[in-house]
Every structure is written in structure tokens, then in C-alpha cells.
Amino acid sequence: MASVYIPVQNSEEEVRVVLDQLPRDASDILDILKAEQAPLDLWLIIAREYFKQGKIEQFRQILEEGSSSDIDEYYADVKYERIAILNALGAYYSYLGKTETKNREKEEQFISATRYYNKASRIDMHEPSTWVGKGQLLLAKGEIDNALQAFKIVLDTAPDNVPALLGQASVEFNRGRFSESLQLYKRALQVFPGCPAAVRLGIGLCRYKLGQLDKARQAFDRVLQLDPDNVEALVALGIMDLQANDSIGMRKGMDRMQQAFEIYPYCASALNYLANHFFFTGQHFLVEQLTETALAVTTHGPTKSHSFYNLARSYHSKGDFEKAGMYYMAAIKETNNNPHEFVFPYFGLGQVQLKLGELKGSVFNFEKVLEVYPDNCETLKALGHLYTQLGQNEKALEYMRKATKLDPRDAQAFVGLGELLISSDTGAALDAFKMARTLMKKGGQEVPIEVLNDIGALHFEREEFESALENFKEALGDGIWISFLDEKENLEQTGVSVLGYKDTGIFHRLIESGHSVDVPWNKVTTLFNLARLLEQIHKTEAATFMYRLILFKYPGYIDAYLRLAASAKAQNNLPLAIELVNEALKVDDKNPNALSLLGELELKNDDWVKAKETFRAANDATDGKDSYAILSLGNWNYFAAMRNEKRNPKLEATHLEKAKELYTKVLTQHNSNMYAANGSGIVLAEKGQFDIAKDVFTQVQEAASGSVFLQMPDVWVNLAHVYFAQGNFALTVKMYQNCLRKFFYNTDSQILLYLARTHYEAEQWQECKKTLLRAIHLTPSNYTFRFDLGAVMQKSSSSTLQKKKRTADEVRSTVAEAENAVRVFTQLSAASDLHVHGFDSKKIQTHVQYCSHLLEAAKVHREAAEQEELQNRQRLEVARQAALAEEARRKAEEQRKYQLEKRKQEEELRRLKQEEEKFQRIKEQWKSSTPGSNKRKDRVEDDDGESKPSERRRKKGGKRRKKDKSSRARHYEDDEEEAATMDDHNEVEDEDANTNYNREDEMTTQEAEEPVDDDAHDLLAAAGLEDPDVDDDEVPTSGVRRRRALSSSDEEGELMEESHPNSSPQKEKEESNGEAGDPNMEEEEEEEEAN
């Protein structure tokens, strides 16, 4: 049993104080310590013992008395003990300030601690323990940098000061510098291996933050070896076990948390983890107790944030969104609005705000979550839905598409994407829903009815009725509807019709026969869609049965009443349709759809006043926000303006202006409403503003063409009407024809009537008649078309007879048209129910008389036209015979010219062939001649004496050749004369040719008798000839050169007859050179070659 001894003053006796039996009133001990003037270290020992025993007041009383001014004055020379007492008080108040939850009290405690540390520094400003205390105080106040400076002051003078090392390690840990903190903890342990277990706790926390989980676990286990009741180590190991994500680890983790809670019930971390455990077990009352306790015992921001989060989650799961939101915001506040510290409260708050309709706040918080986890699919899906509700579809699609890319196996993400795409891209929406269905089936999940219904509805809107039917059947499963779909039940025998919609006997009979007529509430919509599909594919009886089945099980299902009313309207049973709509209004007398349909039926029933009141009621039921009701009122005003046959201009203008106002109101609310835009265009067209109306109709047409949900043939018809009013009949016809083909498969008689009117105005009578015949074929009971056909034939006949020039065929056609018109009008006049169709018998008789008159006139015109046609045929026959005779003469003349040309070509070819043969003979003769070298030399020597006479003879021979050439030219000019004369000329030419040939022979003989020297090749070259035996490369390569050689040979033959027989070859060479230099000679040669 530990004791301390207080020495008695002026005596050797001592007062023994047992530390375990300290008095409850510290005043007794203080009296002894003061009376005996006990050493200050005893004061400190006794005060510390009181603190250990939890007697904080006695501890504070003793230390405050030990730091009083009297004590300071009495123990002025005792520095260390006085400093120790002051530092103990500073540490105590630092602890109070750290644990205080109220800011004001916290600040007061820190001020007291600061005062004691400053007083200790005044005693000795270099005391390390004082700086360590100051560092701890600054660390508790959150002044990390100042705390670091305080610890450094100590470590600069005493590097191995363990408290300073531990303080600096704590600072580095709070600064996130876990490696540096770990080194400082290890250094402190090296300096003092026997330090408390808390040092190893710091090492474990550093290693945990650094991701060294195994070494961290070793450190925490060592702490528990040294201190089995260390709560922090138990909590740390419990967290690590829980993070293992397996059943064994989670069980061990919760056991450690429970153990820590039993050791110290005020450990906030243990309380939070226990609360989290009980949240998942559904024990919310324990969650609230534990988190409230944790909040009461901790001031640590992150720990309090976790406590608020647990409390918020508990209220959130119970549906108390107001409290949940409040605690989520408290959790966020404890993290200083930094989502990176603790992001879960942001996600929870976003969910709560979404439930409460605070969409923008929800978006803000989910965006904060994305800052920390940008690839979190749940957050992306939530933001996709939020932006959809805010009307920002582009952003919504962006987030949904990102979610599907990040997790292609998330079926719900594809469902959300499909819901977003329904209004903009049905194909992509259908693909998304199909992908979701595939993923669900692969995952073994049951595909929700809603998904199958959406897939079926999209197929239905795309007119893929078979696929829609399969999906609706899959969504509905087994039921009575299967029997009717497979035609196992005879609908006719069952007695299904719209008329008996109140008769429930059919269903009672089915129940009695063993059939189940149950319709689960979550299948009603799909069953309605199935009935709508059957109605679309003309299985009206089966659809009627489905609607009646829905009403049998759910009498308040208004849409079923409205579809039955639509069926009755299609059968032209307006009273039954009105009765069914009234039944729907009994369920909800302010249903805008029912009121709008009732107004339409009343309008069709020509009950204008009631229709207007009904449309107003539909508009009031939606506070003026229902576009259909406003459009119906606008249509009513338009029809009212057009209804009055007398056309009161003032009333008409009033109704049109009101209609325009209502259409504009709809466009203001929904600027993409094409029906309102179409109505505005109609009003503009009625006012004569055709260009503006045309622009409006064109824009509506383009918008409607880009939508698969919307079919608007009306806008095509209206646009055609505008073209018609502007007189552009070609475009009008094209628009009507396109509308017929695109929307009505060329079977709408009313549009055919519009088309016929256009042809009529364009005076295209035959096209008009064909169009009316098509309309009559489609609706043979419509006598209006027959009357119009008769009028068209009447007009066609009249216009043909009024022509100044017309053929007999046209007149005969006119007679046929007039006869048909008489027949049509006669048939109409014989009908007994003319008044039903709005015809006047007197007016029809007038048409009959007029057509009969046309017929008589047409017959007269026909006879005249036939006579004129006969005369024209006779004139044409005479002209044809004359033309044939002229053609025969022309062909004979062409044949004669052709024969002459052919004969001329043959003669030319024969002449060229003879010249070629002569050339070949001359070549052979020159080759066979043997030249003499001595005679050549003699010729060369005599060249100078014979040059001039030879030149004169050259000129004389040139004139003869010119004369011969002109003779030949005259020969070619006479080719146009008669055949007999041509024969005489040919004989003359043949004689001339023979004469020339004989002269050439004589020249050749004379030349052969003369000796030839070694320069014979040069002579050949001068005459235009070359010896092929001398040099093969010098053979002439063109026909022109050959012809020049022949010409030269002819001239030489003539010259040789006139010259002296002893003339030398040298003179002949000079003469040949003279010919080569004569330009007239060259021209004559060129003319001959051309001919």
C-alpha cells in the first residue's frame, strides 16, 4: 500500500499519508502541507493521486493552491516543482478544452491553459516540459504549424526528448505526413523502449494509413499484449476485421467493437460502428441511442460526422425525411463542407431532397458525390432522373449513357436510359429496354411487367404489331385473355359488343365454366395496351372484350370507357358514344380527356352550344393548362366562323380572331405543338395571308415528317389548299397525290375530290374525269361525285366546241362526253332520294337540257369536221405521192453521181498502178547496166562546155511539161460531161500514156548504150532515184519521192529525144539540178501528186 511522508517542521517526525486513503476533503491535506511547509513535489504527488482516483476537484484544488502567490513567494527558489505544478494545470485545462463541446466554454478552458503555461515560462522560458505542454495545447486548438514550432524548440536543444518526439509525430500525422510521423514514433520507441503502449498505437495507425495493413495489425496486436484493455487498439483491429468483407472477419470485428464498448462505453468510434451494425439489423432504437451517446462524448469532427450520418440513415429508412435531411446536413457541416473527407452524407441528403421535391438541391449534392466518385453508377443514374425532371434531357442522356458504359451489366441503367429516349429516339429506347430485358434474363431475374409493357408499347408505336403482341402476352402471362387471343372462345357466341357494356353476365358465365377473370392491378395497363393493339389490327370484338373485362374488375378505369366510346363513334353510333363518355364522367366529372371527347361528339352531333360549354369545362378542369382542351375551343371557333353559309363578315372575323388567340396560347405553352401551328396556318389562310400560311404549313410538315409518333395528313391537305388558292395547280396536284399515297394508300375519296377540283380549275378535263371515276369506285353511294362527273363532262364538251380549231377525233370525243353527261344527269334525275343528297331536281333537268343541246351541236360539228378531215386526207395523199416521186428522182441522181465517182477512183488507181510498174522497170534496168570508169571520167571533163545548151533545152522541156500538165487538168475537169464524151477522153489519155511510155523506153535504151562510171549513184540521187544495191539505208521511204522519180523520168525521156546523142551524163546531171531549182516545176509536181 503506497504512502507518502510529510516531514514535521522543527522535528524529526513525519506524517504518513496513505495514497489509497486520501481524505475526501482535500482541505485537510492542504492544511498539513501548508503547516509543515512540505516540499512541492509532495503536493504534486498527492494531486496526481487524486486525479488517478477520479477526484478531479481535489486534484485541481491542490494544484491551484500550490500555484498561488503565497506559495510562489515562499518557494521562490524552487523552480522545477513550481513549473511542474503549473504545467500540470495547463495540461488539465487543455484536456478540458479539447473535450468541451460548447465553443464558448472550450475557448475559456484554452485561455486558462495558456495562462498557466505562460506563467511557467516566466519562471524558466527554456524548460522543455513547458514547451511540450504548449505544443499539446496548440495541437488541441488546431494550430498545427505553431504546435510544430513548439516541439521543434524542444528537439533543437534535446533531440531525444520523448514527449517532444511524440508531439511532433502527432503533428505530422495530422498533417497527413504519415511516413515522417512513423519515423518519429519509431525514434521515440528506440530512445525509450519502455514507453507506454500508446506509442505503438501511433505506429499502427501510421502503417494503416500507409496501406501496410499486416504491419499495422502487428502493431495493434502488440498494443493489446502490453495493454489488453486498450480501447483504441480494439477499435482499430475491429475496423480492419470489418473491412475484410467476409462473415468471419465481420463477426470478429463486431466482437472487438463490443469488447471496446464494454471496456469504455464512451468510445465514439466503437459506438458508431455498433450503430452501423444495428442499422443493418433493423434495430433503429439502438442506432439512435448509440449515435446520440457518441455525439455526446466526442468533439472530433469526422467522428461526429459519422454519428450524424448514422442517425440520419435511421430516420431516412423510417421515412422521416425532414429529420433525416437535418442530420445529413449536420454530418456535412462537421466535415467543413468537404466531400472528400466524408461523402456519404451528400448522397443521403440528395436522396432525401429528391423525395421532398427539392430537385436543384438534390442535383447539387449528387454532383458533390461525383467529385469524389466520378464513376459511381448510382449517382449517375440519380442525376439522369433529376435532369430529366428539370427538363435538361441532354445532360440526363449524358449521365445515363455514361452509367451504361461504366457498367454494361446494370439493367436498371438501361431501363433509365430507355425511359429518357422514349420521347426523342424510339429506336434507341427500344434497344435499351431490350438490353435491360436480356441482362435480367441472363442474371436469372424476373423481367418486370413495366419493362415488357414499354417494349410492347414501342413496337406498337412503330407499327410492329406482331412483336408488340408477343411482349404484351409475355407481360400478362396466363389469363382469360389468352383464350380469346388464341380464339379458343367464340366471341360471337359469348355476345361481346359495345352495346352490352353494362352486361356483366358474360363474365359470370365464364366464372361458372371454370375460367378465371382475375386481372392483377399491375397488369391492368398492359391489358389495356393489348386491347388497344387488337383494336388497331381490326380485332374489334376481342378488344371490346378486354375493355369490358377491365371495367368489370376496375369500374373506375376511365380510359376503357373512352375507348369503347371511340369504337361506338367509329360505328357512327353517336348516342352510345355520348352515353359511354358520360359513364366515364360519373367516375371523374372533371376528367379533361372525357370532357374533350364529349365536346367533339357534341360538335359532330351538331350541338354547338353544348360542345362549346363542354370544351370550356375541359379547359377549366386543367386551369387552362390542357393543350387539347384549348385546341378544341380553337377548333370550335374556326368551325363556327366557317359554318354560316350566309357568311356574316363581322361574326366570321370575330370567331377567326378568337381561334387564332387560342392557337397562339397553346403555342406559348408548348412551342412545338404542331396541331396549334396547323390551326394558326388555317386562320392565316382564311384571312388571305397565303405566303405566311404556306411557311407555317411547311414548317409543320417538316416537323411532322421527322416524328414516328405523329401522322398529320391535314397539314399536307392545307398546304395543297394554299397552293390551289395561289393558282399553282402543278404543286397542288403533287401535294394531294403525295398525301393520298403517304397516308391513305390512294383510297380517300375526299382528297380525290380536292384533286379533281384542281384538275377542273386547270382545265385538265380528262385527269379530272379519271379522278372522279376513282372516287366513285371507292364510294359508289355518293351521288355528289356522280353529279361532279356529269358537270366535268359537260364543261369538257362545251370547251371543246368553243375551240376555233378542233379535230374530228376531238369532236367525236365531245359527242361521247355529251352523251355520257346526259346519261349521268338523267340517272340522277330519276333517283328518288335527291333531297337526301342535297340536289335540286330542276337544276339537274337544266343540266340535262343543256347537255342535250351540246349533243345536237356536237353532231353538226362532227359532220363538218369529218368532211374537212376527208378533204385533208385527200390533199395529204396527193402531196405524199409527189413527195415519193421526188424522192425517187433524188435517189436516181445520187446513184448516178455515185457511179461516176466510183469510176473516177478506179481510173486513178489504175494510173497509179501503171506508174508504179514503170518505176519498177526503170529500177531493174539501172541495176542491170554496167558502168565504165573511163567514160565517166570523160563526161566529167566535158561538163563545163555543155552546161548552157543543156540549160536551154531544160527550159524548153519545162514548157512542154507545163502544157502536158494543163492537158491533164482539163481531163479531170471534164468528168462531169456525158458518158460517151468521157470514153473519148479516156482513149486520148491512154494514147498519150503509151506515147510517153515509148519515149521513156527510147531514153532508157540510149542511156543503156552509154558507159556509166563510179558516180552512177550520184546521178540516181540527182534524178530522185537511188540504187538499193549500193546502200540499203538509202531506199526512199515515201510515195511522194517515188512520184517525183517517175516525173523526172518522163522529163528526161522527152529531153533525150531532142538533145544531141553525144551529150554527156554530166550535162544531164546539171539539167536535173536545174529542175530541182525551178520553183514552177516543183509546183507542177505538187499539183500532180495532189491529183
Curated annotation (Swiss-Prot):
UniProt tissue specificity: Expressed in roots, leaves and shoot apex.
Presence of keyword Acetylation: yes
PROSITE patterns found in the cross-reference section: TPR, TPR_REGION
Sequence ranges of the TPR repeats: 90-127, 128-161, 163-195, 197-230, 232-267, 305-338, 343-376, 377-410, 412-443, 449-482, 558-591, 593-625, 640-673, 674-707, 713-746, 749-782
InterPro entries named among the record's database cross-references: Ctr9 (IPR031101), TPR-like_helical_dom_sf (IPR011990), TPR_rpt (IPR019734)
Region (Disordered): 919-1091
Name recorded for this polypeptide: Protein CTR9 homolog
Source species: Arabidopsis thaliana (Mouse-ear cress)
Protein's gene: VIP6
